[in-house]
């Protein structure tokens, strides 16, 4: 299955949740697209579980095959499966760049990583799905510091709160990962237990 690259607002409306954060078009029309978008539909247990899984996938920009692998990895962890799944998703490098305020959206963060703008612990990384660990250090590469995306990030620093498990230091926009997040530190509007139930069938 190819990655969805169409209008995110349309997916937000279909799933009835803001997948971007601050999507004004969604706020104006928070109901599914199409001529029957406002009609009430009977929501089965399966539909609710499927929608929650799709919400998570589109929020983090992950394809189905990879998302299932994350779920299977979460099952093997000693903690609660749903919480471990969210922790895995949050530890992706593209998400860390978004959370640190270096990109306006996760989609933009994924593009910045793919274009090779970052080092992790001094090593060049251009894979958006790269997973960070506690005490990792993410740096903007020297040649990228004065490019437009990072100039904008410096100008807009502080507009969006940075989660407590991360710290952004100085004009070089160095990102320190103090820990991987606990569930209480993850603000995505998801009911992860529904995702667990979806895959448990």
Curated annotation (Swiss-Prot):
Cytoplasm keyword on record: no
One GO MF term attached to the UniProt entry: rRNA binding
Keywords assigned by UniProt, alphabetized: Ribonucleoprotein, Ribosomal protein, RNA-binding, rRNA-binding
Record-level GO cellular component terms: cytosol; peptidoglycan-based cell wall; plasma membrane; small ribosomal subunit
PROSITE patterns found in the cross-reference section: RIBOSOMAL_S4, S4
GO annotation, biological process: ribosomal small subunit biogenesis; translation
Transmembrane segments: none
InterPro entries associated with the record: Ribosomal_uS4, Ribosomal_uS4_bac-type, Ribosomal_uS4_CS, Ribosomal_uS4_N, S4_RNA-bd, S4_RNA-bd_sf
Domain S4 RNA-binding: from-to ranges: 91-157
CDD domains registered for this protein in UniProt: S4
Quaternary organization: Part of the 30S ribosomal subunit. Contacts protein S5. The interaction surface between S4 and S5 is involved in control of translational fidelity.
Similarity field: Belongs to the universal ribosomal protein uS4 family.
NCBIfam families: PRK05327.1 (NF003717), rpsD_bact (TIGR01017)
Job description of the protein: One of the primary rRNA binding proteins, it binds directly to 16S rRNA where it nucleates assembly of the body of the 30S subunit.
Extra remark beyond the main annotation: Was identified as a high-confidence drug target.
Protein name per its UniProtKB record: Small ribosomal subunit protein uS4
Organism for this UniProt entry: Mycobacterium tuberculosis (strain ATCC 25618 / H37Rv)
Encoding gene (name): rpsD
């Amino acid at each position: 299955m190819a990655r969805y690259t169409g209008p995110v607002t349309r997916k937000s409306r279909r799933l009835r949740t803001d997948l971007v954060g601050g999507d004004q078009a969604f706020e104006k029309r928070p109901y599914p697209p199409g001529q029957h978008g406002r009609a009430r539909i009977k929501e089965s247990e399966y539909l609710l579980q499927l929608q929650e899984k799709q919400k998570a996938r589109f929020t983090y920009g992950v394809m189905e095959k990879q998302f299932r692998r994350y779920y299977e990895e979460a099952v093997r962890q000693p903690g609660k499966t749903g919480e471990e799944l969210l922790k895995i998703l949050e530890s992706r490098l593209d998400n860390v760049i978004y959370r640190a305020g270096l990109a306006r959206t996760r989609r933009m963060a994924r593009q910045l990583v793919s274009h090779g703008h970052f080092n992790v612990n001094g090593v060049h990384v251009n894979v958006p799905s790269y997973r960070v660990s506690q005490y990792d250090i993410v740096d903007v590469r020297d040649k990228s510091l004065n490019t437009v995306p990072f100039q904008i990030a410096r100008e807009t620093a502080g507009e969006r709160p940075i989660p407590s498990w991360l710290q952004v230091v100085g004009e070089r926009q160095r990102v320190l990962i103090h820990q991987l997040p606990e569930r209480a530190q993850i603000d995505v509007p998801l009911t992860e237990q529904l995702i667990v139930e979806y895959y448990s069938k």
